Every structure is written in C-alpha cells, then in structure tokens.
Amino acid sequence: MEQTKALNALEPFIVLSKSATSPRAAADLVTRVTSAPNTFIFTELLQTPQIQSLEYSHEFSSYLTLLQIFSHGTYADYIANASALPALNDDQKLKLRQLSLLTLVANDGSNVPLDYDAMQRENNQAQPPNQSYASLTRRLELSSARELEELVISAIYAGLIEGQLDPANEMVQINSVAALRDVPARGVNGLLSSLQGWAGRCQATLQELEATMANLRDEADRRATEEQEWNNKMSQLLEDEQKGAVPSSSSSSLPFSWFNNTRGGGGGGDGAGAGGSFRGSGYSRGGGLSQGYRSSQRGSHQQHQNQSRQQQNHHHHHQSNQSGTNSLLTSGGGSYLSFREGPSAVSPSAAAGLMGSSTSFAALGGMETGSGSGSGPLGKRGSSDMDDSEEDIDDDTMDLDDEGDETKRGSKRKLTA
C-alpha cells in the first residue's frame, strides 16, 4: 500500500520530465521531486532520458548525483560530498533523513545503501534490531534527542517504519520497515540471491508436502485393501458356515448307527444335561442297581427329553413290576455299559431285555454314558417290546383258561353220560 502511494506521488513528475528539454528544467524537476511529500522512490524518474542527460551537463550534473542519493543513499553520503552537491532545503533534509533512517534500521545500523536484507529478515521472521538514540543522532547529523524523536515520529506517520520510542532507555524499538528504497545497481545481485533462496525454500516445502500427500494416499490405499480382504474373508466364512450347517429339526434325518456286544445280563442308566441333571436307580427281577451319567450339547432341551423318557419308563415299570420293585428293564442280572451320541437316549440292549451283559454304542449328535447292574430306564423300543411280551402272556393266559374250561365241560359230559 505504501509503495502504491509513493508511485502515485511520483507519477506527475514523470509526466513533467517529458517537457524538461533543457538541463536547467531537469535540475529544477529534481529539486521539486525531492522536496515533495510522499515521494520516496525515484528509479523511474532516474531512468528517463531527460534526467540522464544531466550527466553530460557540467553545470547541473550534481543534480543527477543528488537524485541518486535520494534514491538509494543516506544523509552521510550527502555530507561526505556536500561541497560538490546543491544545498538542501528543510523539506529535502527531512526527507533524506527519513530515508536514511529507513536504511539504517533495515541494514542493522550499517551505513550502507539498502540492499533488501530487510526482505530476507522478514522471510526469516526476524525483527530489525533496536537502535540507540546516540547512534542514530550521530549518523543522521542531528543535534539532540528531541530532533531524533521528531524524526522517528514523522517516519512512523509516513509509513516508513513501525516502532516505539523508549525515552527512559534512550532506545528506538523497530518492529518493521517498509520497502520504500530503490535498489541500487550493486544491490541487484543480493536481491537475486534473496529471491533464489526464497524460491528454493518454497520448492523444498512443496516437495515435502507432495511426499506427505503421497504417503497418505499409499496408507489410505493399504487400509482400503486390508478392509476389502477382511470383508471378503468374513463373507467367505459366512457362506461356508451356511453351506456346512447341519439341520437339527429332526433326528431321524441324521446318520444313525449301532454296535452291540451282549454278554449276558441287562443294565441301564440315567442322564445329566448341560442345563440341569437327573439321576435315578431301579431294581429289576434279576436284581442290581443302575446308575449312569449323561452329557449333551443340547442343554435344557436334552434334560426335558430325559425327564420325559424317565416318566415313560416309570410308567412301564409300574405295569410290568411283578416282584415289588419300582422299575423293570430286563430279566436276569449282570452289568451294562452304554455309550450313545444323539439327541435321544435309546438303548436297544436294555429295550430288548437281552440276557447277559450288554455294551452299546450309538453315534448321532450328543453323548450318553451309563453303567451299572440290574436294570435302568427303558427306551421306546424297550417299552414297545415289553408291551408285546405282556400281550403274549395275556394271550397265553387266556388260552390256558379256555383249555381249562373245555376240560371241565368234557368231564361234566362224561359224568352226565
């Protein structure tokens, strides 16, 4: 913004330079432009042919040197060549001292023209160093601290610097400086170096950002691939589980096999499920105590089936008990061992009432074991076969009764005859 104001203030003098056809007119233009307020840059005016022609004028060539000092020199440069230069009015002295203050604080107090080291320090986020009253008063050819304070205040209002005065410590605290000094020819190389360094830092920053973005994209792709593989595995596992699931609605549809080894006697047992337990014992006509244990993967469902079968077995025991016992399985005595896997407990050997000891194996889905002597609970086949046996006994009894009646009637006929 300050540069725009300075360029706008210089523009009228550039237009006037076109009409300054004589060295005197050009020299007068130099005096006016260096005395005008808000004109702090003069390069464009220096490059005009009319101003450059002053170099060949023996009488007015000093005005060209004076304009060059205002462009990129200091007040000390003017004092060093004051005898060969035109005298300065009060406005010119104030302006040259303001520009010199800008150069001094920007260049760390060294009495050299501004070469845009301030730009480099701004890029490095460094503040110009503070200046003492004594140093600035001496370099700017001022007579008192009061004059220095007035100069600093005018430079702050002109937008050349930002800072504060510290009268107690006699220090000028500089916060920032404006780029309102022209670049001399000898300062171009330094400016190019600063710009190249700034461009290099920008390029390095861009490369780091691109590398970081590439790493983030690779990481995102890797995570997406892992997630897709995981989803595929889970889908395949679910599909395999559905295809390989065993239906449990009906036990008759499952594979079923028996292996029996009978060595006399009969046996039985009871059951214990995952959801609870049931234990019982009974005596048959052959004598003996049966006790068994059952484990099942079906929990309370198996327990319910065991209790139902136990009730059925007690019912059949009551019907077929002929010796005062409360359960009937097989006739005879011996030992019985049964291993069974499946949702139901059916022991063919116990149901059939085989003589001797019996060992049975069944493979289906759960597991049942039983051991003991004497009798245990009947399965469906046992109860069915026992009912058939009872019916046969009843038929035989009825046949004997019929034969007895027939014998009585025959004897009675003989006596009558």
From Swiss-Prot:
Question: From start to end residue, where is composition biased (Gly residues)?
Answer: 263-290, 367-379
Q: Which residues form the PCI domain?
A: 2-179
A Pfam family cross-referenced in the UniProt record is: PCI
Which stretches does the entry tag as region Disordered? 240-417
Per the record, what is one GO cellular component?
COP9 signalosome
Give the location in the cell.
Answer: Cytoplasm; Nucleus
Q: Does the keyword Nucleus apply?
A: yes
**Top-level lineage group:** Eukaryota
What the entry lists under InterPro entries is as follows: COPS7/eIF3m, PCI_dom
Sequence ranges of Acidic residues compositional bias: 385-405
Q: Where is the composition biased (Low complexity)?
A: 291-311, 320-330, 343-352
Key words of the record: Cytoplasm, Nucleus, Signalosome
Grouped into one coarse class, the protein's main location is cytoplasm
Tell me the subunit arrangement: Component of the COP9 signalosome (CSN) complex.
As for family, the record states:
Belongs to the CSN7/EIF3M family. CSN7 subfamily.
Q: What does this protein do?
A: Component of the COP9 signalosome (CSN) complex that acts as an regulator of the ubiquitin (Ubl) conjugation pathway by mediating the deneddylation of the cullin subunit of SCF-type E3 ubiquitin-protein ligase complexes. The CSN complex is involved in the regulation of the circadian clock through its control of the stability of the SCF(FWD1) complex.
Name-wise, this protein is: COP9 signalosome complex subunit 7a
State the species of origin: Neurospora crassa (strain ATCC 24698 / 74-OR23-1A / CBS 708.71 / DSM 1257 / FGSC 987)
